[in-house]
């Protein structure tokens, strides 16, 4: 303990930032105390630094002197010291350069790079605040005990107490198993903006309503007077301050709500100081908006990883997850907001729509945040950034932390073109319907391959290096070699991940599945699994700091070899293999033979394998990665069929799924045909909801830059002409209208078309029938029969024909 006024503070770390006090950077740790108070801890002794890797052409002392001469009064170079580190597995001597102002690091980096004798400048692109928590081994969402001195809360800060860090800070081991979200204040919000048939402009279009809700509280609506929204935005600022949330959740607020509110507030002269410091939200890492002292979490970032949901609207995602069903809520299109605001008889519907949006947002937060909190703890990225970052970046921040512990210098990110290499083995399936099929899953195959064969950029044998065959592992097919010892960077990290996950799964067995303890541990093991499984793909990712194409090639080669060996053994056991895909095998469910195969894989090959699921019935086409299956618990899996993937309407997707369900559950092809005929009849009678006819496709570049004429581009151009802003990455929804011209000439934005304009026969001929036939054609069903005529058949007929 340092000094008589020092005290111990137990607090949960929520976020980290820094501010400049004069020319001195001060780290800010935002958290909550064990007594529920909101606290801030300052530390002004940490300084930014980077490493210089010499090329050997100049003496290290001479190079250090050259670097010192670059020092500038605005941010002096405080020290240049010689250090020993490792870089891609090799011992190196480097220079650690420390300066004063974080923003000057990039400038010094460029100046140092121009000096003779410099091979590279490393770790100059790591943000200062993240650098601090990496070096001090602090993880967001975890609890810590720190030696602190209490100080007065500085002007402009909205916290209960403030401290300066005066001594050690260590993890509070008594709270490791505590739910990180317990006791946190969560607030959901959504805004409605006035506009009619064009992109809203914050310079002139008002924010007419803001809905917000504190977890467990009532939904509140702040409403403009006519179109005067100054009081609405000012009222929102005051409500955020009074609720004082630790976590603010929204849906797409990083891309729309925050930028709009920030700009609109400036226009109106309102200070949007919604954080715990008197500053407005600022754009931060990975496109998220930083709200000082609060975690601003965009739930759309979580939804982006729900590959089963094609169109990621709030309504669709909330419906899919059972939070708020579409049929139980008000649904409006963005372009209807102005109309419903202007009509007093419709304004209550608009209020209900906003309430439903806020309710859906809070419901999604309850679903998503537990995983996000655990992923934040595992990766080391704050909760508001962790899902905004791609999985590669999430893993990389954990790797950077591990590198710091191991004395490894972090490589720079280098721009590379997308490389290609042979992927996993995929067997051609045995087409037809198969009953009682077990799916065997190789648990974490690729991370385990990396551990077993010590795969990594630091263990890769480079051209010109000589090692005996007994000293290396040689990958089949590709021939890449990896040193058996010492353990590589990735092996050390993955061993920790895999061991950590095994311990958690063992601990889970001590708790009932519906208990809070089990659920917390389950989210934690999922977060660890996500990062561990990302490691192989990461090495082949062009943006990776630890990029290694040979490593990625070797891992997939070993994966193919393991699958082939398992298939050969299955053949020897008389176990029929129906299909194989990446890290799984589909086999006839003969329990005794399946058990013998599992034993062989575990004991002879050294890999974990388990029965992942059993299909009561599964149907394969002749194509790879394309099947539909009915599990023993009644769930339908549809994999690889066009309506699940490409430019298909929701109606086509629904039809295909229902056809699969009928065929697999009832065995009656005729019942499936009748279902399709009924859909066609409803279409022609105008009884299908127009929203189910919308086809969605993403713009990859500005509409005017497309050379080929495509339907979604035509729709985007029509939107632009109507004053609606469209940018690359936007999902364009269109319907096909009547007419005789090419398809692209008949595409129209769905909100600009009437139901009467829709070309029903296009949807019959090019959507519903093809989607259904992708399955039914294998049972002898033709397009003609779907549209009328033909005999009854059953699944049994097809199975007999296949014998």
Swiss-Prot record:
Keywords carried by this UniProt record = DNA replication, DNA-binding, DNA-directed DNA polymerase, Nucleotidyltransferase, Transferase
Looking up Gene3D superfamilies in the UniProt record yields: DNA polymerase family B, C-terminal domain, DNA Polymerase, chain B, domain 1, Helix hairpin bin, Palm domain of DNA polymerase, Ribonuclease H-like superfamily/Ribonuclease H
GO MF annotation, one:
DNA-directed DNA polymerase activity
| Superkingdom | Archaea
Could you tell me the EC number(s) of this protein? 2.7.7.7
Which reaction does this chain catalyze? DNA(n) + a 2'-deoxyribonucleoside 5'-triphosphate = DNA(n+1) + diphosphate
Q: From its record, what is one biological process in GO terms?
A: DNA-templated DNA replication
SMART domains annotated for this entry?
A: POLBc
Q: What family is this?
A: Belongs to the DNA polymerase type-B family.
Name of the protein in its database record: DNA polymerase 2
What species is this protein from?
Aeropyrum pernix (strain ATCC 700893 / DSM 11879 / JCM 9820 / NBRC 100138 / K1)
Gene encoding the protein: polB
């Amino acid at each position: 303990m340092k000094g008589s006024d020092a005290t111990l503070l137990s607090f949960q770390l929520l976020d980290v930032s820094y501010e400049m006090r004069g020319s001195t950077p001060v780290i800010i740790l935002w958290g909550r105390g064990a007594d529920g108070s909101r606290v801030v801890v300052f530390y002004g002794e940490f300084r930014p630094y980077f490493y210089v890797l010499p090329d050997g052409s100049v003496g290290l002392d001479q190079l250090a002197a050259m670097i010192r001469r670059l020092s500038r009064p605005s941010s002096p170079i405080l020290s240049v010291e010689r250090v020993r580190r490792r870089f891609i597995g090799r011992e190196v001597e480097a220079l650690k350069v420390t300066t004063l102002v974080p923003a000057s690091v990039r400038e010094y980096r460029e100046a140092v790079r121009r000096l003779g004798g410099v091979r590279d400048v490393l770790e100059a692109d790591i943000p200062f605040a993240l650098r601090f928590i990496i070096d001090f081994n602090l993880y967001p969402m975890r609890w810590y005990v720190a030696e602190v001195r209490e100080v007065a809360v500085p002007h402009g800060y909205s916290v209960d107490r403030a401290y300066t860090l005066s001594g050690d800070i260590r993890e509070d081991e008594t709270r490791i198993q505590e739910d990180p979200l317990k006791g946190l204040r969560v607030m959901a919000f959504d805004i409605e903006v006035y506009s009619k048939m064009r992109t809203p402009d914050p310079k002139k279009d008002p924010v007419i309503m803001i809905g917000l809700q504190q977890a467990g509280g009532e939904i509140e609506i702040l409403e403009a007077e006519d179109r005067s929204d100054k009081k609405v935005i000012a009222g929102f600022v005051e409500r955020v301050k009074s609720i004082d949330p630790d976590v603010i959740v929204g849906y797409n607020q990083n891309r729309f709500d925050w930028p709009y509110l920030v700009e609109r507030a400036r226009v109106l002269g309102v200070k949007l100081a919604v954080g715990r410091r008197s500053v407005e939200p600022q754009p931060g890492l990975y496109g998220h908006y930083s709200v000082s002292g609060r975690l601003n979490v965009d739930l759309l970032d979580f939804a982006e990883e729900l590959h089963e949901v094609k169109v990621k609207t709030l309504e669709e995602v909330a419906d899919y997850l059972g939070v708020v069903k579409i049929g139980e809520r008000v649904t409006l299109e963005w372009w209807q907001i102005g109309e419903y605001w202007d009509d007093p008889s419709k304004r209550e519907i608009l209020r209900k729509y906003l309430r439903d949006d806020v309710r859906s947002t809070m419901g999604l937060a309850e679903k998503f945040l537990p995983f996000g909190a655990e992923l934040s703890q595992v990766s080391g990225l704050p909760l508001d950034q962790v899902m905004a970052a791609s999985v590669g970046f999430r893993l990389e921040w954990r790797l950077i932390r591990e590198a710091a512990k191991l004395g490894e210098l972090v490589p720079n990110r280098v721009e590379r073109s997308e490389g290609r290499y042979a992927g996993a083995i995929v067997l051609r399936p045995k087409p037809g319907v198969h009953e009682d099929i077990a799916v065997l899953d190789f648990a974490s195959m690729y991370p385990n391959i990396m551990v077993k064969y010590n795969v990594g950029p630091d263990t890769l044998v480079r051209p010109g290096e000589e090692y005996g065959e007994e000293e290396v592992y040689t990958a089949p097919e590709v021939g890449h070699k990896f040193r058996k010892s010492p353990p590589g960077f990735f092996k050390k990290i993955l061993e920790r991940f895999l061991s950590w996950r095994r311990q958690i799964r063992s601990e889970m067995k001590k708790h009932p599945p519906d208990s809070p303890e089990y659920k917390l541990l389950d989210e934690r093991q999922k977060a660890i699994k996500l990062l561990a499984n990302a490691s192989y793909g990461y090495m082949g990712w062009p943006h990776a700091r630890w990029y290694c194409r040979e490593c990625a090639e070797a891992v997939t080669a070993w994966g193919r070899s393991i699958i082939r060996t398992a298939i050969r053994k299955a053949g020897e056991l008389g176990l029929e293999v129906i299909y194989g895909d990446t890290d799984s095998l589909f086999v006839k469910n003969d329990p005794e033979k399946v058990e013998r195969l599992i034993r062989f894989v575990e004991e002879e090959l050294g890999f974990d394998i388990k029965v992942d699921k059993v299909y009561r019935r599964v149907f394969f086409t002749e194509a790879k990665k394309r099947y539909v299956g009915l599990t023993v618990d009644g769930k339908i899996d549809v994999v690889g069929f066009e309506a699940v993937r490409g430019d298909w309407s929701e109606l086509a997707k629904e039809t295909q799924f229902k056809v699969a369900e009928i065929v697999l559950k009832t065995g009656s092809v005729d019942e499936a045909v009748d279902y399709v005929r009924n859909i066609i009849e409803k279409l022609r009678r105008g009884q299908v909801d127009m929203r189910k006819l919308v086809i969605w496709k993403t713009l990859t570049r500005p509409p005017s830059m497309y050379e080929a004429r495509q339907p979604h581009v035509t729709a985007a151009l029509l939107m632009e002409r109507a004053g609606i802003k469209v940018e690359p990455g936007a999902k364009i929804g269109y319907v096909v209208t009547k007419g005789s011209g090419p398809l692209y000439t008949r595409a129209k934005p769905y909100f600009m078309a009437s139901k009467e304009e829709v070309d029903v026969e296009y949807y019959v001929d090019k959507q519903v029938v093809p989607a259904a036939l992708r399955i039914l054609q294998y049972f002898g069903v033709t397009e003609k029969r779907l549209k009328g005529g033909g005999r009854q058949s059953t699944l049994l007929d097809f199975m007999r024909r296949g014998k």
